[in-house]
UniProtKB/Swiss-Prot annotation:
Membrane topology: Single-pass membrane protein
Predominant cellular place of this UniProt entry's protein: membrane
Entry protein name: Putative transmembrane protein ENSP00000320207
Extracellular side: 24-124
Organism: Homo sapiens (Human)
Source organism phylogeny: Eukaryota, Metazoa, Chordata, Craniata, Vertebrata
Length: 124
């Protein structure tokens, strides 16, 4: 009984991860990005977060247009509207930046002009 419950939980976790990766890769096209500007605006806290029952390590960047970038350990990053989450990232967590909605500010528009493919970042 315990083995079948563990197997089903593991299988559902795998299915959700695959589904999220599929959505990110095929429905969220790359946008413009400036990694130095993003790293400068890094914010992190210690509040735990979970999505669909899965524990994620997330990071958020705050921008003038109110968009945030969400990241999870082992999965591509996703750009979503809303306030940036404040979560603790473990050292060594690999972050893949996959999509970004650039801010409209004239101050940053020139810096946010490079086309994004994939940028990786390792939390130290």
């Amino acid at each position: 009984m315990y083995v079948s419950i563990s197997f089903l939980l593991g299988l559902s976790h795998l299915v959700l991860c695959c589904l999220l990766t599929f959505i990110v890769n095929f429905y969220l096209p790359p946008e413009s990005i400036d990694f130095e500007f993003m790293a400068h605006n890094w914010s992190k806290g210690r509040s735990p977060s979970s999505t669909l029952g899965l524990s994620w390590f997330k990071a958020g960047f705050r921008f003038s247009d109110g968009w945030s970038m969400f990241y999870s350990s082992g999965l591509p990053g996703v750009a979503l509207p809303g306030s940036p989450p404040r979560s603790h990232l473990l050292p060594g967590t690999q972050i893949l930046i996959r999509s970004f909605q650039p801010c409209e500010s004239a101050k940053h528009s020139a810096r946010l002009s490079s086309l994004l493919t994939t940028t990786s970042y390792s939390v130290s």
